[in-house]
């Protein structure tokens, strides 16, 4: 009987980990959407909201990391569960970095005078692709969809290419 209760508790802990990870992913998606909107509108109020959200994303990262460590130490997961917990640890590191980058963009909006070019298609495409990649990454993790995960990884090159175009445009004054 105790084994059944402990197994149920363990399952609940894994579900809670997934829910927290999904919430963190959604927070990152929102940060990117808001960053792009704040850039377009030069909205310093929205920029401040993004910076606050960046701090919250960092708190989420620490909370999830703590949950993962407790699961590893107290439950000693094996096989698929161990892979899930290990993957969660890697994912939260990347999500936190995304949150920090969104906060950095917001800080630029607050401090730098710039003209936003509405025709900056690479920037728009980069924002949209990044948001979709986060969504797909979360889906691949929760559904354990290896094919979707691999396809998402391949799309990272597209975002890198778009970033280079954006950077080139900014440096040349064309954005």
PLM feature spans:
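Cytosolic, long alpha-helical scaffolding segments
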Residues: 1-175
